């Protein structure tokens, strides 16, 4: 995301992170879940449009693979999350650590 400013390379939301089996993760947001690691960026409207296109998300469409939700972080700031529902076909293998980057590195080292 050219021009987007990274505020935090290791921040957290609560939920369950899954390996979709397609090379990217899927998040179920759940305040009772474990910590899920992410990055926080300051973006503009064009960045948001680009992210929506990347995630194949359309605000006016009834059936998206992901839903974009506004989330409040522990410090009171807000961010958007792209989340799935528990019945999503992307919910495959639970990532117990909640850390996608660690998960993919560990998978590479065991293959």
Swiss-Prot record:
The keyword Oxidoreductase does not apply. GO terms for molecular function: acyltransferase activity. The keyword Iron does not apply. The active site is at residue 55. Coiled coil: none annotated. Belongs to the gamma-glutamylcyclotransferase family. Putative gamma-glutamylcyclotransferase. This is Putative gamma-glutamylcyclotransferase BH1612.
């Amino acid at each position: 995301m050219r021009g987007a400013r990274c505020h935090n390379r290791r921040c957290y939301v609560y939920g369950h992170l899954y390996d979709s089996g397609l090379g990217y993760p899927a998040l179920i947001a759940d305040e009772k879940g474990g910590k899920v690691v992410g990055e926080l960026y300051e973006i503009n409207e064009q960045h948001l449009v680009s992210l929506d296109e990347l995630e194949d998300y359309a605000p006016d469409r009834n059936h998206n693979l992901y839903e974009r939700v506004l989330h409040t972080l522990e410090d009171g700031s807000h961010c958007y999350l792209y989340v799935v529902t528990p019945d999503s076909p992307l919910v495959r293998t639970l990532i117990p650590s909640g850390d996608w980057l660690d998960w993919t590195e560990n998978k590479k080292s065991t293959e």
